[in-house]
Amino acid sequence: MKKLLFSTFLLVLGSTSAAHANLGYVNLKRCLEESDLGKKETEELEAMKQQFVKNAEKIEEELTSIYNKLQDEDYMESLSDSASEELRKKFEDLSGEYNAYQSQYYQSINQSNVKRIQKLIQEVKIAAESVRSKEKLEAILNEEAVLAIAPGTDKTTEIIAILNESFKKQN
């Protein structure tokens, strides 16, 4: 991806007839943090995280309760062998369920985060193209691909404004 961006950048620089190319850049992180779309996507991700955490806490409480019973010698001695074995089995099963739940949590959060970023990048591309054509720029690059550029070429604020306008129309 970075090689492709760099190659595209070199191609744009090489294809301009003048020594000075008219370029801009966008800060994707700012778009994610400051745009209404980015804020909404972040809120949804946080809500998803909170739901997972709440459910995990319930399982943790139950695991702790069973663990404490298993560690209490007096309690364990008062149980029949079958009840004692059943409690151990319940602890093992619940531990496995908890581990599977945590794995599902991380996988779901990662997938949601990737989708969130992909969605934002698609919207930023549309907004960047609008700014590029309006301001007659050769290209708008991702800030991470730019090592040095003249002051005043940051188009992030303009792109965030377009993202917010588009978000308001859609909602």
From Swiss-Prot:
Ranges in coiled-coil conformation: none
Cysteine disulfide links: none
Highest taxon in the source lineage: Bacteria
Keywords of this entry: Signal
Gene Ontology MF term list: unfolded protein binding
GO BP term (any one): chaperone-mediated protein folding
Membrane-spanning segments: none
One of the record's GO cellular component terms: cytosol
Signal peptide: 1-21
One Pfam family this sequence matches: OmpH
Family recorded in the similarity comment: Belongs to the Skp family.
Record PANTHER family: CHAPERONE PROTEIN SKP
Listed name of the protein: Skp-like protein
Organism: Chlamydia pneumoniae (Chlamydophila pneumoniae)
